[in-house]
Swiss-Prot record:
Belongs to the MCM10 family. The gene is mcm10. Residues 550-563 have a biased composition (Low complexity). It comes from Schizosaccharomyces pombe (strain 972 / ATCC 24843) (Fission yeast). This is DNA replication licensing factor mcm10. Residues 211-593 are annotated as: Interaction with mcm complex.
Length: 593
């Protein structure tokens, strides 16, 4: 049989030989490596190579990081001084998770319960009235004999100067001490829309000055009340007195420094207004008169109706209210062109400013001025200069047109006088052609058209015509008309002759002396001839000098034979109207009677 122990020994021998062989190989490698190192060291000693020069390192002097920052970036707040090490790009820390609905509902109920308990406690601890007056039997003397008393001091509670004190400082301290005191501006800051809740304290006192008392008023139900305007010489607040409070304090005078105990807050009907009022209706002593104010005054200006303004003001600032000061400034600004447009809203009355800025979301009082730059304000100055130049040119053009109108009037008067002189010089002639040749162009400007002539009056008195000069116009009418029309169409033909009385009339227009007339003459009146004669001038040319050729005379003057030729030598009663045109191209003058 094969022995296992012998086989194991053989394996160990083989393993030992293998390990011995590996050891010999390693030692041989070490020997060769050491020989190579020695050979390399010998070669290095033989060959000498110069080493390259070392690189010079430039040393920079760097200032502190704070000095390298731009000052503008620091001033503007752009550079926060943080570097990359200070900024992390990872997710930020997670905040607390929102509470679930049931927890938030429970907290809301707890807060409401605490608030209701607080209100109950406040109502329980709230005073109904100021403390009662001292018992006279305890002190043995009465202080009412000393008050009201003149003084010149500042009340420590209202912080107002008083000149007359109605109660002593000790009494005021007993009644007001221990309560929360609010001035007008503090209460306006505390009570806010839309809830308008009173201060959540046990007892509070509102101090103010009675600026005005509205007097007795009546509600719709017939109940009486009054309204007191309280002020601290800067802000104002209204307080209404109803019921027993009205019966007790309706006679309070203006200028009295008062203290109100726990007044109710009266909400406005329109919450957007942002103004609330106070209300007193208690039957207890809730109003305390401290003294009379020193600096409260009233405006001395007068309204349009003539009554005094009577608006309250601080006498230290002046005797005129802000509204009338602004009006006076606006009047002075309106006379100066540099303030006419650009600063229109600089001095606007407060009530108008509040009305203009009041709207959706506006609550409270206006507490500042608004300045706005008018667009193109600089360009408007150049436009104003052009407007002045245009106005100057327009006035010069009107002046020229008026001078031209006066010249036309003088020409018309001279032509009328020449007409009268020509008529008087032709009184001895019996030929119509001679009479018409003596007439000037101005006489024909008078638009003599027979029955269509309108008489001109000399100083308001019409020229009288003799009834003896009237001749029946029906005799020989067709032949005369034919001859006159032929003479008009043919200037070389002779005109028929007419009497001088028919041409000139009863009175001479130039001299005013009566002219004898031939009553036996059977010649036709030239008025009948002119009725059917064609017009020499066009209506446009006649209107240019002030006469309307389409005007018809009264029916009572159509049968007159010499009315159309009778003219007055004076044109004083003729009214002219000058009509000017705005256009530079059309500077024609038109005279309309």
């Amino acid at each position: 049989m094969h022995d296992p122990f012998i086989a194991e020994e053989n394996d160990l021998d083989l393993e030992e030989k293998r390990l011995q062989r590996q050891l010999n190989e390693i030692q041989e490698k070490k020997r060769l490596r050491s020989a190579q190192k020695e050979a390399s060291s010998e070669n290095a000693e033989v060959i000498q190579v110069p080493r390259s020069p070392p690189q010079q390192v430039r040393v920079l002097t760097v200032s502190s990081p704070s000095k390298l920052k731009s000052p503008k970036r620091l001033i503007l707040g752009i550079d926060k001084g943080k570097t990359g090490k200070d900024v992390s790009l990872g997710k930020g820390p997670r905040g607390p998770l929102p509470k679930p609905f049931h927890e938030r509902l429970a907290e809301a109920r707890n807060q409401e319960r605490k608030r209701s308990d607080k209100l109950k406690t406040m109502k329980k601890n709230r005073k109904q009235s100021f403390q009662r007056k001292r018992n006279i039997l305890e002190d043995g003397k009465s202080e009412e004999e000393k008050f009201p008393m003149k003084c010149d001091e500042i009340d420590p509670y209202s912080r107002q100067a008083i000149v007359i004190r109605y109660i002593s400082d000790e009494v005021a301290k007993e009644n007001i001490g221990g309560n929360q005191v609010y001035l007008i501006h503090q209460l306006l800051k505390l009570v806010r829309a839309p809830k308008f809740e009173a201060p959540e304290v046990d007892n509070y006192v509102v101090m103010g000055i009675v600026a005005s008392n509205s007097g007795t008023r009546e509600t719709v139900n017939g109940n009486k009340y009054c309204m007191l305007t309280l002020t601290d010489l800067k802000w104002q607040l209204e307080c209404f007195l109803f019921g027993k409070a009205f019966e007790r304090y309706w006679k309070i005078q203006s200028g009295t420094v008062i203290a109100l105990l726990n007044p109710e807050v009266l909400k406005p009907k329109n919450p957007d207004i942002g103004r609330f009022s106070l209300k007193l209706d208690s039957e207890y002593d809730v109003l305390l008169e401290i003294g009379r104010s020193k600096h409260l005054g009233y405006c001395s200006s007068r309204r349009k109706s003539g009554e005094l303004c009577k608006h309250w003001l601080d006498k230290r600032a002046g005797d005129v209210c802000e509204y009338h000061v602004d009006l006076a400034v606006q009047r002075s600004m309106s006379t100066r062109t540099e303030f006419a447009s650009s600063m229109a809203t600089m001095h606007e009355p407060r009530a108008r400013r509040e009305k203009r800025f009041r709207g959706q979301g506006f609550q409270g009082y206006f507490a500042g001025e608004k300045y706005s730059a008018i667009p193109n304000a600089v360009a408007g100055l150049y436009d104003a200069e052009d407007a002045v130049q245009t106005e100057r040119e327009r006035k010069e053009r009107y002046k020229k047109q008026r001078a031209q109108a006066e010249r036309e009037r003088e020409i018309l008067v001279r032509l009328s006088k020449r007409c009268c002189a020509s008529s008087s010089s032709s009184s001895n002639s019996n030929n119509l052609s001679t009479g018409m040749s003596m007439r000037t162009l101005g006489h024909q400007y008078l638009n003599l058209q027979g029955s269509g002539v309108k008489n001109l009056h000399d100083k308001g008195n019409p020229t009288a015509l003799s009834k003896d000069s009237e001749i029946d116009s029906s005799t020989k009418k067709p032949s005369v008309l034919a001859s006159f029309n032929a003479s008009i169409m043919n200037p070389k033909s002779s005109l028929p002759s007419f009497s001088n009385s028919a041409i000139l009339g009863t009175n001479d227009a130039a001299s005013g002396t009566p002219v004898p007339q031939d009553t036996t003459s059977t010649k036709v009146s030239p008025a009948v001839v002119f009725t059917s004669s064609p017009r020499i001038f066009s209506p446009q040319s006649l209107r240019k000098i002030g006469f309307d050729p389409t005007h018809s005379a009264d029916a009572s003057t159509t049968h007159s034979t010499a009315t159309g030729l009778s003219r007055s030598g004076s044109l004083k009663n003729i009214k002219f109207r000058y009509e000017f045109t705005e256009s530079d191209d059309e500077d024609d003058l038109e005279i309309v009677p």
